[in-house]
């Protein structure tokens, strides 16, 4: 019979299980379970009490004045999601002015809060990570031992008037290797706006690099030994594959993650996404979409503050042609995490579907700026907004970036060429849709794209009709 814990109690139990046999300080537990949020010890005590009530009084031992430890004699806990732990250490102030110390610390704290919003990476709060300054390689193992971090973010900030230069690097502490580093600089009036813009760019890229590093580790392990988080990463990689050919493989990884950890809300969310993408983006059957919505609902019930859950729910509602609900969930996702490039991009796509392509292009440009190594679909969504604005040549150029165009991409590209008057290229795209493929370009234009307004579907269909001759 399954046992149920609230998300915070479960996160606490998970961290204790990862540190079996070690006394975990209260400050560390509070940083991991409530990242970037100030809470009192009462919250921690309440979660420990809940674990003991569900699993037994002896499950968690209190070590006076030190912390808590999972009982060594307890039965081995099932594998847990094992999210990576990131510590953002205090940045170096290279301005030469002690008055800038508060600004430099505030910048690093903004990074902590930004990374914490993703919910896919555990980031330690400043009272732990700021106990270290930016140390050299020799001190990295010490940081890992003392605060349990897998990755370290360090850097520096220099200000000269309104000119800001930030250097940042991401370090894998276990291998003592730098995974990523970059420099950001900005000119202009309004120091707060400059700082916010740089934070926005860094946060998204940091999370992407940590996720990619986790995927590389997971790819080297046998599937049977993967933790739930690693299984999730393997499935996520298949969903972002430009070839878009293995959604079933992605589903299998998400299902395996759920089997390992039945309370892993994000695994239900991504399984819902994989199901919703069945049928080439928005053309899945009503039954498939309802199943996807049920899975997304469960994911949100388990992880109500997970922004990805609302983003996926938004996409499913869009595919179900419930445009108001789609925008409602999208705005919640952005409120929970305004740094996520995928959410920013998806907001642009949604606005195109709602008949607001000019607004959409602003959002899409911001998503591309935050994530220059963005997935392929960013450009495809941008192309549709451009088409709706009558910018057919720019739309075609964006679609031409596809290396293995699916029939729906060829249909949109044919419509662009036809609207430009290049009928030879338009008909070539139609001809390249394989013989015997049940895909109908005109049906796709009229019913396969989840436009809110019939006039937008007719606009796309107009180009397709021209291409069909």
What is each residue range found by the language model?
Residues 56, 72-79:
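Juxtacatalytic C-terminal regulatory tail of Ser/Thr protein kinases
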Residues 442-469:
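Terminal, low-structured helical/coil segments at or just beyond the last alpha-helical repeat
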Residues 403-407, 418-440:
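TPR/TPR-like (Sel1-like) alpha-helical repeat modules
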Residues 3, 10-11, 18-32, 38, ...:
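Acidic, proline/glycine-rich low-complexity intrinsically disordered segments
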Residues 60-63, 123-124:
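Short beta-strand
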Residues 218-221, 284, 438-452:
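Acidic, Ser/Thr-rich low-complexity linear motifs
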Residues 50-57:
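Residue cluster at the C-terminal edge of the helix-turn-helix DNA-binding motif
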Residues 62, 66-71:
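Minor-groove-contacting beta-hairpin "wing" of winged helix-turn-helix DNA-binding domains
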